[in-house]
Amino acid sequence: MTSVLFTSGATVTFRELIEVITSYDFIVETIIGNGITRMIVQYGNEIETGTQKHVSEEFYRQCVEDKELKQSLQLEVVSGSQNDSNVVTYRSNKYRGFEMVVFPFSNDIGSFISESDVVISHAGTGSIIDTLRLEKPLIVVTNDKLMNKHQEEVADELVKLGCCRKMTIEDMKSSQLKDCISEILSGPETFNKLPECSTTEVEGIIYHELVK
């Protein structure tokens, strides 16, 4: 089973990312088209202060409903996770063997990273460090809606180190992401492995960008 993990972080809902990955055409062409049989989506855990409304969950569900994704892929619920009731698995009756695993947030995100062949992440420092520590191929998607550009600067530094690839939302909408995933899955190792002290080095880069 070939798996890809999309993680949008826990605080601010990365709406543009969610909008792209809930597109039927995107899933069929970029995900299923690359032979991926398991698509894991961590869509966010943003809670509105005062009302306690789950902003991320509501936005994700609205995207799925508006695009009639469940009907298009003929998705049916397989089960909730035995360990986490927030995790739901869907199986496609249209594309046999394909399944989606979705959840807002997990305290054990490392297990989802570990089982993934490719991680496509927002540019949050926590998600980046978690993925690099587990030495998984990483594609960072920057959010140009954020006023503070430190995430993009961090991603640029990591690209220079050869640790990851960087994409924009527009890149995801084109064939660039599909081609990048294909290269990672079919080709030799395309990312530099970090030396033993690298985690400290990367954390230093992140700290430097945060305090600038």
From Swiss-Prot:
SUPFAM superfamilies: UDP-Glycosyltransferase/glycogen phosphorylase. Pfam families: Glyco_tran_28_C. It is found in: Endoplasmic reticulum. One of its GO terms (biological process) is dolichol-linked oligosaccharide biosynthetic process. Keywords: Endoplasmic reticulum, Glycosyltransferase, Transferase. InterPro entries: Alg13-like, Glyco_trans_28_C. It catalyses: an N-acetyl-alpha-D-glucosaminyl-diphospho-di-trans,poly-cis-dolichol + UDP-N-acetyl-alpha-D-glucosamine = an N,N'-diacetylchitobiosyl-diphospho-di-trans,poly-cis-dolichol + UDP + H(+). It comes from the Eukaryota. Involved in protein N-glycosylation. Essential for the second step of the dolichol-linked oligosaccharide pathway. Heterodimer with ALG14 to form a functional enzyme. This is UDP-N-acetylglucosamine transferase subunit ALG13.
